[in-house]
Amino acid sequence: MAVFKTTLWRLISGTLGIICLSLMSTLGILLKNSFTKLSIEPAFTPGPNIELQKDSDCCSCQEKWVGYRCNCYFISSEQKTWNESRHLCASQKSSLLQLQNTDELDFMSSSQQFYWIGLSYSEEHTAWLWENGSALSQYLFPSFETFNTKNCIAYNPNGNALDESCEDKNRYICKQQLI
């Protein structure tokens, strides 16, 4: 009888040991995957006190796009000419960024990069126009009159704009308006 109890005890403790090892292994794998996902950083850092929208009622964006104030933004990490950037945005059913106001990109306020935006000079209208044909509001870029009309406009989320040859390569921002 004593031999039977010892054998049964060893069988139970061995089984519990194997179950414990399996649970520990599973926990280790889950923790490793969790830390790997956390270490992936986006191409920009959101500013303080700004909540990015993810799958909210008014904003559901594609993968690699950022939802903010019911718009979706694609912030490129690769550099392209202005026309290449424009075509890439159009292929994603969006357009190069058209700014509504200077705080539209608050979520990118820590970025120092310049990005192509959808602003170009129209010889026909003798005015700076956004891709949708609307005119530029002068309050967006107070020193705008110094820009060369043969160039394209690059914008920094800190509110700076500069004109560069359209053949230069910059990162770009695509925007999809959802509402």
Curated annotation (Swiss-Prot):
Pfam families documented for this protein: Lectin_C (PF00059)
Membrane topology: Single-pass type II membrane protein
Highest classification ranks of the organism: Eukaryota, Metazoa, Chordata, Craniata, Vertebrata
Effect of N158A: Has no impact on the affinity for HLA-E
Role played: Immune receptor involved in self-nonself discrimination. In complex with KLRC1 or KLRC2 on cytotoxic and regulatory lymphocyte subsets, recognizes non-classical major histocompatibility (MHC) class Ib molecule HLA-E loaded with self-peptides derived from the signal sequence of classical MHC class Ia and non-classical MHC class Ib molecules. Enables cytotoxic cells to monitor the expression of MHC class I molecules in healthy cells and to tolerate self. Primarily functions as a ligand binding subunit as it lacks the capacity to signal.
Disulfide pattern: C58-C70, C61-C72, C89-C174, C152-C166
Stretches in topological domain Cytoplasmic: 1-10
This protein's UniProt keywords: Adaptive immunity, Cell membrane, Disulfide bond, Glycoprotein, Host-virus interaction, Immunity, Innate immunity, Lectin, Membrane, Receptor, Signal-anchor, Transmembrane, Transmembrane helix
Consequence recorded when altering E164A: Impairs binding to HLA-E
Single Gene Ontology BP annotation: positive regulation of natural killer cell mediated cytotoxicity
Family annotation (SUPFAM superfamilies): C-type lectin-like
Name of the protein in its database record: Natural killer cells antigen CD94
Subcellular location per the Swiss-Prot or TrEMBL entry: Cell membrane
PROSITE patterns, alphabetized: C_TYPE_LECTIN_2
Top-level division of the source organism's lineage: Eukaryota
Result after altering T146A: Has no impact on the affinity for HLA-E
Chief localisation class: membrane
Transmembrane segments: 11-31
Gene: KLRD1
Any one GO molecular function term: carbohydrate binding
GO cellular component labels: external side of plasma membrane; plasma membrane; receptor complex
Quaternary context: Can form disulfide-bonded heterodimer with NKG2 family members KLRC1 and KLRC2. KLRD1-KLRC1 heterodimer interacts with peptide-bound HLA-E-B2M heterotrimeric complex. KLRD1 plays a prominent role in directly interacting with HLA-E. KLRD1-KLRC1 interacts with much higher affinity with peptide-bound HLA-E-B2M than KLRD1-KLRC2. Interacts with the adapter protein TYROBP/DAP12; this interaction is required for cell surface expression and cell activation.
